[in-house]
């Protein structure tokens, strides 16, 4: 199957929202062995949408649309496709009843145009919307499969996973099982990682190896096909073993795992508590950690010590250090980590201090970072020189904190 994703909505062209739907769908289609060759974005204009469909059906046999299924006049996806394919729009009774029930339960008036959301293409396979009003739909015309999905990701993603993906798998009539596994790496660049496993990438057949760099991390997606799922997993195991034999020090987890979730799990496993002193990161590290369920079992507390006054008066960094070496220094990071550990009575204390930019600080350039980690066995400090904008430096600093803690805990 050759797939094309057409996102409909002027807000996408204006840059008001990001096209995360295309990213999600491309990932999901890759997992089931469907190749996506084109991404197209079209505004709320029936003529331009018609042209995009005419082009797409000449080069693709699966076209997935997102957006344009709402109740307003600029929601034209169904109407445009119906006209092109010479299909009528008919009322889906189940969807209509669901819409009526929603307005009845919420005691809100229903506009006449809400009925439009329950219309589907004649002869289509209806994809139920359990998180919104407008159903999706799929149909095959002249050997081209058209799938229409709502625009809001909170509606589109569960609809595709529960109804759209199974529909496509059934249409493909493929006996092979497709298994994917993502390996996650940190503290190694994409080019270095590819160099280390270049021969494996060059020789890939089944499984395939797909590298991707994002936010200071690198991932490898391994995908294998076999009639038996167990054999597909075994093929992936073999390739994973060969990869990790070369780059294991940089590997930290699988699939949707993050450095923060890995750290949380490891702290729980080791029965350790953590306290945090954040200057450079301004609470970002704790924000990421406490967003995870059960974080309270390992996070003892923290201090956002953005000013020297707080560093000195709350975390008792000696004035002499701040005056002679500055807040962005090894000794300051060491003192912050040790004293936040004492303050919160935790097993481990970690500190972050540095220069996020856009201007230099204390004569130190943007990207200068110090991290301190204090335990009962002593204190270690780590110096970094990072690049990127302010937010990138802060996030990478927080991730390096996770990385160094994981190294210590293992």
From Swiss-Prot:
Q: Which CDD domains match?
A: cinA
Pfam families per the UniProt record, alphabetical: CinA, CinA_KH, MoCF_biosynth
Q: Which domain of life is it from?
A: Bacteria
Q: Where is the signal peptide?
A: none
For this protein, the record's PANTHER family field holds: NICOTINAMIDE-NUCLEOTIDE AMIDOHYDROLASE PNCC (PTHR13939), NMN AMIDOHYDROLASE-LIKE PROTEIN YFAY (PTHR13939:SF0)
In the record, the note on similarity to other proteins reads: Belongs to the CinA family.
Protein name per its UniProtKB record: Putative competence-damage inducible protein
């Amino acid at each position: 199957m050759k797939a094309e994703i057409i996102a409909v909505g002027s807000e996408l062209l204006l840059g008001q929202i990001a096209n995360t739907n295309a990213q999600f769908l491309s990932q999901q289609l890759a997992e089931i062995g469907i190749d996506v060759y084109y991404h197209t974005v079209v505004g709320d204009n029936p003529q331009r949408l018609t042209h995009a469909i005419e082009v797409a059906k000449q080069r693709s046999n699966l076209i997935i649309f997102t957006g344009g299924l709402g109740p307003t006049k600029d929601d034209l996806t169904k109407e445009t496709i119906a006209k092109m394919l010479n299909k009528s729009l008919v009322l889906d009774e189940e969807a209509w009843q669901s819409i009526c029930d929603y307005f009845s339960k919420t005691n809100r008036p229903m506009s006449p145009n809400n009925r439009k959301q329950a219309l589907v293409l004649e002869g289509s396979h209806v994809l139920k919307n359990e998180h919104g009003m407008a159903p999706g739909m799929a149909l095959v015309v002249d050997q081209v499969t058209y799938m229409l999905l709502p625009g809001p990701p909170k509606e589109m993603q569960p609809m595709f996973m529960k109804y759209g993906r199974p529909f496509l798998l059934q249409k493909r009539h493929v006996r092979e099982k497709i298994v994917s596994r993502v390996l996650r790496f940190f503290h190694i660049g994409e080019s270095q990682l590819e160099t280390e496993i270049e021969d494996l990438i060059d020789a890939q057949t089944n499984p395939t190896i797909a590298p991707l760099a994002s936010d200071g991390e690198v991932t490898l997606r391994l995908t294998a096909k076999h009639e038996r799922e167990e054999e597909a997993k075994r093929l992936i195991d073999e390739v994973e073993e060969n990869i990790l034999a070369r780059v294991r020090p940089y590997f930290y987890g699988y699939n949707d795992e993050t450095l923060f979730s890995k750290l949380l799990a490891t702290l729980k496993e080791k029965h350790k508590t953590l306290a945090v002193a954040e200057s450079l990161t301004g609470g970002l590290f704790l924000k990421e950690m406490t967003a995870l369920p059960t974080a309270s079992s390992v996070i003892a507390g923290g201090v956002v010590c953005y000013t020297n006054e707080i560093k000195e008066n709350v975390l008792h960094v000696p004035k002499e250090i701040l005056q002679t070496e500055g807040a962005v220094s090894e000794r300051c990071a060491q003192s912050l980590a040790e004293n936040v550990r004492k303050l919160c009575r935790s097993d481990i204390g970690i500190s972050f201090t540095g220069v996020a930019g856009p201007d230099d600080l204390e004569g130190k350039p943007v990207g200068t970072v110090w991290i301190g980690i204090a335990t009962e066995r002593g204190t270690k400090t780590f110096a970094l020189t990072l690049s990127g904008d302010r937010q990138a430096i802060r996030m990478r600093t927080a991730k390096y904190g996770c990385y160094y803690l994981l190294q210590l805990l293992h």
